[in-house]
Amino acid sequence: EAFVNEVKEKEGMKLNDSIYFSLSDHIMGAISRLENGIRLQNMLLLDIKQLYHKEYEIGLELLKKVNETFEVDLSADEAGFFALHFVNAEDGGKTDSYQISIIVHQILDIVEKYYDNMEFQEDNLYYQRFLTHLKYFAQRFLHKELHYDENQELFKIIKEQYREAYGCVKMIYLMMEEEYKYAMT
């Protein structure tokens, strides 16, 4: 409780009160799993670090505190899980951060493959901006808040002048339609 209150004050975050229970419950579960020899690997850890950098740093601080207080050795994977608790509590539970991370990861995979195994420079400003756009796109997609733009003329110009990018977007569109059964316009 003290840590969450400290984060609220230090970071100026408005957190839903549900974080007190969900985070405490997660910490106790993680310690219990560790005592039973079970370690969960956070498959989205890299995405969490990139998409929710501030929350991940908070998760690392909490991880250090938990390890010291309870004299355990929880892994950095837990810091990623802790970060998601803060992300979800920040938005009052509206955001499904796990699903957003998956969608962003799927789109990044398509972009990397489409452009011949292109590797992103994670510390690049353009990459960070791209991630931010993908994150907000995924959030709007999940809440079906995508808006149709009636300006077909602009669409035609973009489609003709940026054919390669349009091809990549088409692949993303097809994946989203197939995977999530929701057609975007």
Residue spans for each PLM region:
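A cross-family "folded-core" feature that marks the main globular domain of proteins
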Residues: 1-185
